[in-house]
């Protein structure tokens, strides 16, 4: 009897999993646009640079609680994010030029 109950328990778990999967499929998925994602990435790059600039200004003015290593870390993060943004832009321009050179 215990083997049958064990199998019934497994079957009920599988049925519950299948029902939850169907429920998740029926929910409308939010639309994510390429332009929206690109705009959000540019905003994050801008925010990173703003934070670095603000930290550098605070350190220059001698405000307490702002350490040089934090300023340098923020400046490096801003630099790396800007370089990444430039590389993404270069790849997008190259892809656009390749598409435009295709013959229809």
From Swiss-Prot:
Tell me which domain of life the UniProt entry assigns to the organism this sequence originates from. Answer: Bacteria
Localization in the cell:
Bacterial flagellum basal body
Q: Which one GO biological process term can you cite for this protein?
A: bacterial-type flagellum-dependent cell motility
Identify one Pfam family in the record. Answer: FliE
Q: Does the keyword Disulfide bond apply?
A: no
Q: Which GO terms describe its cellular component?
A: bacterial-type flagellum basal body
- Could you list this entry's UniProt keywords, alphabetically sorted: Bacterial flagellum
Q: Does the keyword Ubl conjugation apply?
A: no
**GO MF entries:** cytoskeletal motor activity; structural molecule activity
Q: What is its main location?
A: other
Task: Give the UniProt family note.
Answer: Belongs to the FliE family.
Q: Which PANTHER family match?
A: FLAGELLAR HOOK-BASAL BODY COMPLEX PROTEIN FLIE, PTHR34653
- NCBIfam families for this protein: fliE
Protein's name according to its UniProt entry: Flagellar hook-basal body complex protein FliE
Q: What is the lineage of its organism?
A: Bacteria, Pseudomonadati, Pseudomonadota, Gammaproteobacteria, Enterobacterales
